[in-house]
Design a protein with these regions (language model features):
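Mobile "lid/hinge" segments at catalytic clefts and subdomain interfaces of large enzymes
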Residues: 114-128, 133-139, 143, 150-160, ...
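Short, hydrophobic beta-strand segments
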Residues: 3-10, 159-167, 223-231, 364-372, ...
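Phosphate-backbone binding interfaces of nucleic-acid-interacting proteins
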Residues: 1-205, 341, 357-362, 368, ...
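Glycine/proline-enriched, intrinsically flexible loops and inter-domain linkers
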Residues: 4-7, 11-12, 26, 66, ...
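Extended, well-folded interaction surfaces typified by the phenylalanyl-tRNA synthetase beta subunit core
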Residues: 414-580, 798-800, 805-806, 810-836
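A carboxyl-terminal module marker
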Residues: 23, 440-447, 627-836
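Conserved mixed alpha/beta core segments that line enzyme active sites in large multi-domain catalysts
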Residues: 36, 50-80, 243-244, 261-330
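Terminal amphipathic helices with adjacent charged low-complexity linkers/tails
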Residues: 183-217, 394-421, 428, 470
Length: 836
């Protein structure tokens, strides 16, 4: 949002000095309206004078030049000019005398053009950066005094424009009046001097109402509509002050009528629209939803197919505007317009937002309507100001008007407790200052008691809905810098109640799984009994914990996390074909094996605990590649390794036919283990779901889904999470292709390489070493070129030194020795291992 400093000062009625642009920027930023930049305009224009043409003759040596006799208020000068729109003798122009420097950097000096001296320059608005028209010179009004400085006659020529970053909850700050209101309230409360707004009066010439002028057929989408029929309009270019003001704010001047509506947009934040009433069938408008297959050509020349949910402004026959977004070409104001219907309305923000997005049409009007404009006195004030300017600049007069209301939002009443404000802010805002702040923001305060203020919110502040919003307003204007610094540490430090070890372990594991690209779900702990029967080999039916009052057939506490994850997989695959990567952290429940009470109990356990269901905290992971693609269990074990690393554990994989689980494919499952002082500890399993389980959940036959689970209680405690310094020098990598029997797990191949690297003798002060944690399995190939019963593993190994970069001459012999030693070790268990 661009705010003109000069215009803002015109809107402020201050007893004290006017804030400088820098001071104003500091005030606004402190109020939450962050000033992102200051743009200064008019440098060099201070030297521009009002020149009067005393005579003009054709240049004797150049057909396109005119020799002008120009009076600058003190002397008559000769100036050569090539413009074709020179005014007649007596006309006024913008004159740059010798020595002036234009905004673009051009310095005016005496020149001789084809033998005729030129003692200055007659300027265009483009050369003065007052507009974009560079085809002709800038012609000034005849009433401007000759010899006067131009910037003293036209407000805004020398100006500073503040660029604000307005947050979406402050639609009132999308106009100069709203920003000026904040500044006035701030100055009144902080300085104690009188500060108020200068606003145009709410009056209009006596004119009869015509209720047929406007009809609202969609009252839930249009809360208020003011329509004014204006006649005797003369469309012409806007005066210089209006053109300059719009140009400084980034808008292109078009004509007096259109420019007036744009000026009101920037002044009040209220969009207005002018229809050519002569082009409206019946001379009236209807606010309605678009008809089926109705179309509209908007002002940008685009033919748009309207949706039945679009709100339109129509005449007796067709849609004439997309309400709150853009007008229609068929009723636009043109040079021949003599009758106008002026619209000032409040539309429901949600509908305008939907239409703007549906048609990919964002405008200054829709930007404000989407956030909520004033439907109260601000709407009337913008309309009255526009009517006054139309009468002044275009000669128009109002012959009829109408006000129609639909479902208009009510004014909110909020109870404010000063004691509550002091408690939340940590500082008590003095009563007088608080009342002054609220009054400056036009919030009506009715004191029902010393600690109970009933506040009526103005219609221009839709963001004020709760007591804390009013407290926030008090803090904005009282100032964060007024909050005293307080030593908040308690005198007697007490130890904080920390989370238990299992909770911390679960949180870290969940963080690691999220970092690995998995999404966490939370499913119900109650499931249908028939779903748990698929896991009866692990937890038999007699250990099910049944619920006394089951809901929707879910009468058993879950013994496994997999049913909830599979339900989520079915739900997602039925709606999209994208990959599904899920995990859940939760408890499972089962009765203990046997009901005998032991003679002794572990420390911290009560005797009654053995008669309660056993609870295990588990982590379940499920990966599906999307569509009919197959998930790779290795991607799952990689995610597990990354997550366990956050807990300080290194993952080990081991396979075998003993201790297999029935819900995983018997040929594609491994045990998950972590290192401990006593050796590897099994903490879970991973692999591919059994085809029978895929069929039981109605998933496509042949679909391969990876699943893994971790028992958090089985993880050994780690007091210190392992960490190391990030290497300062890059490692170098070597790719290794090994031909191995299919039965030999890749984990054993990596372990052999790791052992070979550790056994490699070191040489020198900073030897090259194999990075044990950096080995990767890039590819598992089975097919042409590989003997039957074997596969080709493509591995990547990384080598580095602690304090320097390494060279190929160092790495190559090291790599060859490690590969040879690892292959020898592997051949003892699986003959046929060889590099490719």
């Amino acid at each position: 949002m661009l705010i003109s400093h000069s215009w803002l000062c015109e809107l402020l009625d201050l007893d004290g000095p006017v804030p400088t642009p820098e001071a104003l920027a500091e005030i606004l930023t402190g109020l939450g309206l962050e000033v992102e930049a200051l743009h200064r305009h008019g440098a060099g224009v201070e030297a521009i004078l009002v020149g009067e043409i005393r005579g003009k003759t054709p240049h004797p040596q150049a057909n396109k030049l005119t020799v002008v006799e120009l009076f600058d208020g003190q002397q008559t000068l000769t100036v050569c000019c090539g413009a074709s729109n020179l005014p007649p003798v007596g006309g006024k122009v913008a004159f740059a005398p010798i020595g002036a420097r234009l905004p673009g950097g051009l310095e005016i000096a005496p020149r001789e053009l084809r033998g005729v001296p030129s003692q200055g320059m007659i300027c265009s608005e483009l050369e003065l950066e007052l507009g974009v028209d560079g085809d002709g010179i800038l012609i000034l009004p005849d009433e401007f005094p000759t010899g006067a400085r131009l910037h003293t006659l036209v407000s805004g020529i020398v100006d500073t424009v503040l660029e604000l970053g307005v947050t979406p909850n402050r639609p009132d700050a999308l106009g100069h009046v709203g920003v000026a209101r904040d500044v006035a309230a701030y100055l009144s409360a902080r300085t104690g001097t009188r500060s108020a707004l200068r606003l145009p009066p709410l009056r209009m010439a006596e004119t009869s109402q015509d209720p047929t002028l406007v009809t609202i057929a969609a009252p839930n989408r249009c809360g208020r509509y003011l329509g004014y029929a204006i006649t005797d309009v003369k469309v012409a270019p806007s005066p210089l002050w209006l053109r300059v003001r719009l140009h400084r704010l980034g808008l292109r001047p078009i004509s007096n009528l259109v420019d007036i509506t744009n000026l009101m947009l920037m002044q009040f934040g209220q969009p207005l629209h002018a229809f050519d009433r002569g082009k409206l069938a019946g001379g009236r408008v209807v606010v309605r939803r678009a008809h089926h297959e109705e179309g509209l050509r908007t002002l940008d020349g685009t033919d748009r197919a309207l949706d039945v949910d679009d709100l339109v402004i129509a005449d007796a026959d067709d849609a004439q505007a997309l309400a709150g977004v853009m007008g229609g070409e068929s009723s636009m104001v043109g040079p021949d317009t003599t009758e106008v219907l002026l619209e000032a309305a409040w539309f429901a923000p949600a509908g305008i937002r939907a239409s703007a997005r549906r048609h990919a049409l964002g405008t200054d009007a829709s930007y404000r309507y989407e956030r909520g404009v004033d439907h109260g006195v601000g709407l009337e004030r913008a309309a009255m100001a526009a009517l006054s300017l139309i009468s002044e600049l275009a000669g128009g007069r109002v012959v009829a008007w109408a006000e129609v209301c639909g479902e208009r939002p009510p004014r909110r009443t909020i109870d404010l407790r000063p004691a509550r404000a002091a408690m939340l802010l940590g500082v008590a805002v003095p009563t007088g200052e608080a009342r002054a702040i609220l009054a400056g923001l036009e919030i009506e305060v009715h004191v029902d008691g010393p600690q109970h203020w009933r506040c009526v919110v103005p219609t221009h502040r839709p963001d004020l809905v709760r007591e804390v919003d009013l407290i926030d307003e008090l803090m904005r204007h009282h100032g964060l810098d007024s909050v005293p610094a307080t030593f908040c540490i308690p005198r007697e430090a007490r130890p904080a109640a920390g989370a238990d070890a299992m909770t911390v372990r679960g949180d870290r594991l969940a963080d690691g799984l999220r970092e690995a690209g998995l999404q966490e779900i939370v499913s119900l702990a109650f499931v249908a009994e028939d779903k748990l029967l698929n896991f009866s080999d692990e937890v038999p039916e007699d250990r099910f914990v049944r619920v006394a009052n089951p809901m929707r057939g879910a009468g058993v506490m879950r013994t496994h996390l997999l049913p909830g994850l599979l339900d989520a997989l079915v739900h997602n695959t039925a709606r999209h074909g994208r990959p599904v990567r899920l995990f859940e952290l939760g408890r499972t429940y089962a009765w203990p094996k046997g009901k005998a009470t032991p003679a002794s109990f572990p420390e911290g356990t009560r005797a009654v605990d053995v008669h309660l269901p056993q609870e295990r905290t588990m982590a379940g992971l499920l990966l599906h590649a999307g569509g009919r693609n197959h998930a790779d269990p290795r991607a799952l074990t990689g995610a597990v390794a990354q997550a366990l690393a956050r807990l300080g554990h290194r993952l080990h994989l081991s396979s075998g036919t003993d201790h297999q689980v029935s819900f995983l494919h018997p040929g594609v499952q491994v045990r998950l283990a972590v290192e401990a002082a006593t050796g590897p500890i099994v903490v879970g399993v991973a692999g591919e779901l059994h085809p029978d389980l895929i069929a039981a959940w109605g998933l496509p036959a042949g679909l391969r889904v990876a699943y893994g689970e971790i028992d958090l209680a089985a993880l050994p405690p780690t007091d210190v999470v392992l960490a190391r310094e990030i290497p300062r020098f890059p490692a170098t990598s070597r790719d290794l292709s090994l031909e191995v029997p299919i039965a030999l797990p890749a984990a054993e191949v990596l372990a052999a390489l790791r052992s070979a690297g550790a056994a490699q003798p070191a040489s020198g002060d900073d030897p090259v070493h194999l990075q044990a944690d950096g080995m990767e399995v890039l590819e598992d190939y089975r097919g042409a070129g590989v003997p039957e019963g074997h596969r080709a593993l493509l591995l990547r190994l990384h080598y580095a030194a602690a304090g320097r970069s390494v060279t190929d001459l160092e790495v190559s012999p090291q790599h060859a020795a490690i590969v040879e030693r690892a292959c020898l070790a592997l051949r003892g268990r699986a003959p046929g291992v060889r590099p490719r």
